[in-house]
Regions:
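Conserved ABC ATPase "signature" region
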Residues: 115-140
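Catalytic Walker B motif of ABC-type/P-loop ATPase nucleotide-binding domains
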Residues: 169-171
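Conserved ABC ATPase signature
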Residues: 144-148
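The feature captures the beta-strand-to-loop junction immediately N-terminal to the Walker
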Residues: 36-38
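Conserved ABC transporter NBD signature motif
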Residues: 59-68, 81
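Conserved structural motif at the start of ABC-family nucleotide-binding domains
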Residues: 5-7, 20, 27
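Helix-to-loop junction immediately C-terminal to a conserved catalytic motif
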Residues: 51
């Protein structure tokens, strides 16, 4: 498999309603794909399957090289493997600053002890500033995230995902 992600024959049903039927596709590295459709078409269900939130009735989801099944992995293990997901409603820490939100999202060791003992260094601050500039929030790093507009919170969440350096970003 040369694809970053390969979905093959995936079907999902909820109480008899078929949300996905025999979905198959692949995504290569550095490839952009758009999934469009009306409400109820299965777009969110597809993302739920890839990120481990929903287990399919049948089919397979392979990730990386060598290919590994994502179906046996937890949501957190899938995220650590490099799959990032942006939800419809932004989820940011509203009592923390933009800078703090981005700093907490940096790709670092995630054990409880590592998180408690984390002390940002110069490269961490530089990466946060770079991310803030990319998402258009460089001028508001010191503002509390709860003070941002809805659109700015959306961008902040995208920045938080980018901080984790995902190999695949589902938006």
């Amino acid at each position: 498999m040369s694809a970053l992600l390969e979905v093959s024959g995936v079907s999902v049903s909820f109480d008899g309603f078929k949300a996905l039927t025999n979905l198959s596709f692949s995504i290569d590295r550095a490839e952009l794909r758009a999934v469009i459709g009306p409400n109820g078409a299965g777009k969110t269900t597809f993302m739920d399957v890839v990120t481990g939130k929903t287990k399919p009735d049948e089919g397979r989801v392979l990730w990386g090289e060598p290919p590994v099944s994502l179906l046996a992995k937890s949501e957190s293990k899938i995220a650590m493997a490099g799959v990032g997901r942006k939800f419809q409603r932004p989820t940011v820490f509203e009592d923390q600053t933009v800078q703090d939100n981005l700093m907490m999202a940096l790709k670092k060791a995630r054990s409880p002890l590592a998180v408690l003992l984390f002390k940002p260094e110069t490269p961490d601050f530089a990466r946060v500033e770079e991310l803030a500039d990319v998402i258009g929030l460089g001028a508001v790093l010191s503002r509390k995230s709860g003070e941002l507009s809805h659109g700015q919170k959306q961008w902040l969440e995208i920045g938080m995902l980018l901080a984790q350096e995902p190999k695949l970003l589902l938006v």
